[in-house]
Amino acid sequence: MRIGVRIALTVSAGLSAAGLFAAVQPHALAPAAGGWWDVSQSANGHEPTRVCVPTPDVLAQFEHRNARCTRVVIRDSGTTTEIHYTCADGGFGRSVMTLVTPRSLTVDTQGISGGLPFHYKLYARRMGDCQAGIARR
């Protein structure tokens, strides 16, 4: 039985690395939807960055939002999910996302970007659906 599980995990990891499996969406974020999100380092939403995302888990890699990254859910329970991501440019990060309401979440993120460490907390609020013709990130 252990050999079968090991083989399945090895095959799954290989296919995932090759981009043949779609990313699994965290259950903790299921009540939230993609769309326009205002993201700020301030709890009151001061000076937000507005991003259009297909799913909220993309906000886990906010520091690398314009990079090609792969995300792996490493913990997912209740209203909290932990996501590790690795980017093609060598950057990486780990984010703990907590769903406050279906339209509000926090992201505690840390990692390496441009060869330097980063660590900060983000507050994200869903503002609505993305407008037609605007690229999603």
Where do the language-model regions lie?
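Tryptophan-anchored aromatic micro-motifs
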Residues: 32-47
